Design a protein with these regions (language model features):
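Compositionally biased terminal segments of proteins
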Residues: 1-167
Length: 167
């Protein structure tokens, strides 16, 4: 998904009054204020209470649900290789949020960044690094984590510290 597609989509989201948070590769690039690699999709965190409005908006813009990962996560695709990975969450007890039946501190959503000229909410840099752990990483994950760690002075997680052979 290119920057123009993302900016156009963000403007449409803003027009319906739904708050979104960006995560994944575009979330990393938003924090850094520049695009650092190509992206196949954009990951949106949307409150469950806003899910219907958000889904209606993307459907009216040509997106169709192509995959359901769980009740809280689905993939939506449109023409021209535009893909949305939609994550639904809800704010819970004071200072927490619930996603996929897990509880997280809500301050993970305190990140701010830019995509193009658009200011966006996103996961914090530290949260991006934390949630890029514990699964088999792709080269793009390695790129994102190392870039965040080097930019913000975070310790590189052990699973990213060793150079992996190219496959």
């Amino acid at each position: 998904m290119n920057e123009k597609d993302v900016v156009d989509l963000l403007k449409k989201v803003e027009s319906i009054g739904v708050n979104v948070w960006i995560t994944g590769g575009w979330g990393v690039d938003a924090i850094l204020g520049r695009q650092t690699r190509p992206h196949s999709d954009i990951d949106f965190f949307v409150q469950k209470k806003d899910a219907s409005a958000f889904i209606e908006m993307i459907k009216s813009n040509g997106y169709c649900r192509t995959k359901v990962e769980s009740d809280d996560q689905s993939v939506w695709c449109a023409a021209h290789d535009r893909t949305i990975d939609l994550h639904l969450f809800e704010f819970a007890e004071e200072g927490t949020l619930r996603f996929e039946n897990e509880t997280y501190p809500s301050d993970i959503l305190n990140g701010k960044g830019t995509i193009g000229e658009v200011m966006v909410r996103c996961l914090t840099a530290e949260a991006q690094v934390i949630y890029h752990q514990g699964y088999e990483q792709k080269e793009k994950d390695r790129h994102d984590v190392l870039l965040l760690c080097n930019t913000f002075g975070f310790l590189i997680p052990e699973e990213y510290a060793c150079e992996r052979p190219k496959q």
